[in-house]
Curated annotation (Swiss-Prot):
Its cofactor is Mg(2+); Mn(2+). Pfam families: SelO. PANTHER family: PROTEIN ADENYLYLTRANSFERASE SELO, MITOCHONDRIAL. This is Protein nucleotidyltransferase YdiU. It catalyses: L-seryl-[protein] + ATP = 3-O-(5'-adenylyl)-L-seryl-[protein] + diphosphate; L-threonyl-[protein] + ATP = 3-O-(5'-adenylyl)-L-threonyl-[protein] + diphosphate; L-tyrosyl-[protein] + ATP = O-(5'-adenylyl)-L-tyrosyl-[protein] + diphosphate; L-histidyl-[protein] + UTP = N(tele)-(5'-uridylyl)-L-histidyl-[protein] + diphosphate. Its EC number is 2.7.7.-, 2.7.7.108.
Length: 474
């Protein structure tokens, strides 16, 4: 046997065994490595050369025995489209373990599509190649754009044919996160282990994500957990600020899809708008627009309310004190989101974030004229003609001496536009990855004009977005 030159840690499984069910990925009839993210592997101390061996591929499928990995399916609950489900968990996923990057930060190595677990609830536990490659390219694009996100380490085709309306090739995604602790993780701890387990999970969350609070864990007080909650709120606000600037619609902001770290997770029904509008939604199952673009800050606030419900006994010496602390912190969330959004647009416009008047004028024009935000911001960055309706704004904006160099670092030339992603995936599922690799190269170097051909910068043909619909692909 070709021995692995590394060993994953089992930090979550050891710290929270009641929330981790030991499991193994299912056997694949003919596994083949489709793509491997060498740079990400190196950054985590994983050897890409070994990962390409037959033993390495089996490792990436969750098939290696101990001691190399101690894979587990994580338990969590969740509100899905507002409806609470007490036991969700990793129904088609596994946490292989954690790898430590050079800076000492632990990162979850997590599978998606690895087969049934005890949480599958009758589903087959599998994933198909198109949606898996979709998550790979969009998550890596988001990372390159500076958005907090899970990342993609590898895609493996399984050699299995799977029925999803039509027959599709099976695949497993290997993704990476600073952790996959969710709002739904706290909901599960609250109903399964009460405040004792919730406090244990909160303490573990502090050690993984909020080092400034670690010193307080020797003698934690209500202020420790209030600070934790406020730090989580800030992470969510910062992330939604970046989504808003980029015109990104997540599409499934359930509490089980909201990570405590603030990293974007689960890209199944997401999309990038090409007409900037508040009512934009693309998910085939979001019938009533719960998760439409303009609702994203509000929905994250709703999710944060569900989180703080699980922490109330930790936030004060009495129930009334805990409730007051929760309400005060949560009451600041709308302002945190607005501040984050204004900051993002100020940076995109090359202005100081204190220039709220210009930023607000720009945002009003976005909703009035519905431009392609990517093209618009690059036209400002490159000092080319703005679209109709923005002429007067641009004239006044230029008098404020915008920082064009700073703008070049945040306003992308390339994003994973919906029509380009769909074209690349259509070819990929029949074995032609040329368009996929071309698009991946461009969107992972989004500010470099030489990273891809000019046609990858262009919006779709008129009418495409009106009919465009996304699917989870499960």
């Amino acid at each position: 046997m070709n021995t692995a030159p590394f060993k994953l840690e089992a930090d979550f499984a050891s710290a929270l065994p009641t929330m981790a069910a030991p499991w193994q990925g299912e056997e694949s009839p003919n596994p083949e490595l489709v793509i491997l993210n060498d740079d990400l592997a190196y950054s985590l101390g994983l050897d890409p050369t070994w990962l390409r061996t037959p033993e390495g591929v089996q490792f990436l499928l969750g098939r290696n025995p101990e001691p190399l990995t101690k894979a587990v399916a994580q338990a969590y609950s969740g509100h899905q489209f507002g409806q609470f489900v007490a036991s969700l968990g990793d129904g088609r996923a596994l946490l292989l373990g954690e790898a430590r990057s050079a800076d000492g930060v632990l990162h979850d190595i997590h599978l998606k599509g690895s087969g049934r677990t005890q949480f599958s609830r009758g589903a087959d536990g599998r994933a198909v190649l198109g949606p898996v490659l979709r998550e790979y390219i969009i998550s890596e694009a988001m990372h390159a754009l500076g958005v907090p996100t899970t990342r993609s380490l590898a895609v493996i085709s399984t050699g299995r044919k799977i029925q999803r309306g039509s027959v599709a090739p099976g695949a497993v995604l290997v993704r990476v996160a600073t952790s996959l602790i969710r709002v739904g993780s706290f909901q599960y701890s609250n109903i399964s282990g009460g405040i004792e387990l919730s406090q244990h999970l909160a303490n573990y969350t502090i050690t993984r994500h909020f080092p400034s609070l670690v010193a307080e864990l020797s003698a934690p007080t209500p202020a420790t957990y209030v600070s934790l909650f406020k730090a989580i709120l800030q992470r969510q606000a910062d992330t939604v600020g970046k989504w808003t600037r980029l015109g990104f619609v997540h599409g499934a902001l359930n509490t089980d899809n909201t990570l405590i770290s603030g990293e974007t997770v689960d890209y199944g029904p997401c999309a990038f708008m090409e007409r900037y509008r508040g009512d934009a939604k693309f998910s085939s199952i979001d019938t009533y627009g719960r998760y439409k673009f303009e609702n994203q800050p509000m929905i994250l606030g709703w999710n944060m309310a569900r989180l703080v419900e699980t922490l109330l006994p930790l936030l004060g010496a009495t129930p009334d004190e805990g409730m007051t602390a929760a309400q005060e912190a949560l009451g600041e969330f709308d302002d945190l989101c607005e501040q984050a959004i204004r900051k993002e647009f100020a940076t995109a416009l090359g202005l100081d974030e204190s220039d709220t008047g210009t930023v607000e004028q720009f945002r009003e024009l976005l909703y009035l004229h519905n431009p392609d935000i990517t093209t618009l911001l690059r036209s400002l960055t490159d000092n080319t003609a703005p679209p109709s309706g923005f002429e007067a704004f641009v004239h006044d904006w230029k008098t404020q001496d915008p920082d064009f160099e700073a703008m070049q670092a945040v306003n992308p030339l390339f994003i994973p536009r919906n029509h380009l992603v769909e074209a690349a995936l259509a070819d990929a599922i029949v074995g032609n990855l040329e368009k996929f690799h071309e698009l991946l190269a461009a969107v992972t170097n989004p500010f470099d004009p030489t990273a891809g051909p000019d046609e990858l910068r262009l919006p779709s043909e008129e009418g495409f977005e009106e009919d465009y619909m996304t699917f989870c692909g499960t």
